[in-house]
Amino acid sequence: MSKCATPTPSTSSNSSDEAKRSPQPMSRGFPQRNMSTTSSNGSNSPRHRSLETPIVLQPATRFALANLTTTVLRLDFWDDNDPNSIFFCKSTFNIVTQCLDLPEKVIKTVKTHLEGEEDLTDIAPMIMSVREDPVYKTEGSTPFLASLLVAFVNQGNYDSRYRVFLRHLTTLLGVVWTEFEDVEDSLASTLLEEQFVESEHSRTVREKTARNKKIKRYLMIGAAGGVGGVLIGLTGGLAAPLVAASAGMLIGGGAVAGLATTAGAAVLGTTMGVAGAGFTGYKMKKRVGAIEEFSVETLSEGVSLSCSLVVSGWIESDTSPDQAFVHQWRHLRHTKEQYTLRYESNYLMELGNAIEYLMSFAVSVAIQQTLLETALAGLVSAVAWPVALMSVSSVLDNPWNVCVSRAAEVGEQLAEVLLSRSHGKRPITLIGFSLGARVIFHCLLTMSKRSESVGIIEDVILLGAPVTASPKEWSKVCTVVSGRVINGYCETDWLLRFLYRTMSAQFRIAGTGPIDNRNSKKIYNYNLSHIVKGHMDYSKRLTEVLNAVGVKVGPHSEDSVVDLTQLEGPHEATGQAEEAINYQSTGEEEEHPIVHPINLENIHEVKVLDSPHKNEF
């Protein structure tokens, strides 16, 4: 019979303040979290849920769930030309059928649908069959999904494709995604609140491996990380399994019985990244290329089975150094565990100052009119721009070109960090605007060249990206992203066009228009022209932009979201000129973004951009 897990309330442990750390200018990993700070007594911690009550599903329900999951795998993940996707689908199918405890004959029948030997069945009767089950009527579909979650995590690698797969299932089974996130967060808190210690056997194996491979330096890095005295390298913890005391008692039995073992605790420690020294445990002894500053800092103190990393595009002159990479993201609530990348702050500060200086020359009515006509025509030729603007262009060109080059190198370095799994073997979402989006884009391009890159990145959100709009390059990015790749653009971003004025007329910038996504179901284009009044608005109105593309943001006052159209000074010209552009183009272009019809292959998409919470993920 099938056993699934039912979430029920449990207890929590005490919390204490985390010791303050100074930022590490050249660190290579996520900050190590103090276990005590992740207690559920904190305001951001989830309610505890024990995953232990066995639930028995009817045979018809189990068969329907098997067919439903097989259909999702076949339509959304199977690719005949990609061996990795085929392997993922088959291994996931095996986990699901094992969880459902199906007879071998039934498994063989359902598997023919997965492999394309038989036509897929209609999903509507499957969903109706599930809803008729007594368990569904009393508990909903969450017990089954929670059981799958535990089974996936117990593999020691919460692959980002697992999470996207579960997201698709929650949509079909009518489970609110935030409720499922509560289950994830509860499991994460339960695991991280334990006191992890290294077993004697693990220590012996680790030390022997270290001697053989001459990686004593990595052991010292592990000591600096300070995770209960565990000395490990950059692998995220595979070389040093951990033992969680009383894990079996606190996690419970039933569907999670496998997690109560020493091995289960070890792989979960690896999944969460708690077995690793974290990003701050490693300090680069020398520069990587031209990079002078690279570190990942904590943005929020929660814990989760997934995390987010944000990358800013520049630093504004009125921002303090400590808040330079934090303030813009202060309302972000995408996941409970969020990080921000600090990189090349001196150069990004110079760029911010240069942009503000250039904008001060765009105040006159004459220049506004010229910018209006130039942007409307979509011109990038140097001869089309005002002489007054061109006369000071060198002030911006030099810092921009320096930052563009360094952003690409930072992206390559970020790829190495993510491939090292310092954040743990769990999904991570990347969000960036302007040059931050460029960092992420080059990170993904670098990862696309590596075979071990699949299953790490869940979603990617690029806003005002100063990168090519070539479908060929974006298709490479899609190969390493399990979920969505969002391109947020502004058609009237004259500053971005101005910065690329020396490029050929055939060159298209992603931040100024949609990406051709006819051959990719992962790419989503969002026209943000009705929110963004200029390139600098990606920083000033970031909360509104994030809300528009479906990223969760926290409560905020109207004063905290700046309306640039009401500001005086350098930003005024941008707002007035581009409001005129929007007004003149109302009859010719759609105000809303390009969208696709919702189907099973793209069940995580939303049509209406102006309904901020419909596309949350």
UniProtKB/Swiss-Prot annotation:
GO terms for cellular component: membrane. Residues 1-49 are annotated as: Disordered. The chain crosses the membrane at residues 219-239, 262-282, 427-447. Keywords: Membrane, Transmembrane, Transmembrane helix. It is a multi-pass membrane protein. It is found in: Membrane. The keyword Lyase does not apply. InterPro entries: AB_hydrolase_fold, DUF726. Its main location: membrane. Residues 1-16, 36-45 have a biased composition (Low complexity). It comes from the Eukaryota. SUPFAM superfamilies: alpha/beta-Hydrolases. The keyword Transmembrane applies. Pfam families: DUF726 (PF05277). Belongs to the TMCO4 family. This is Uncharacterized membrane protein F35D11.3.
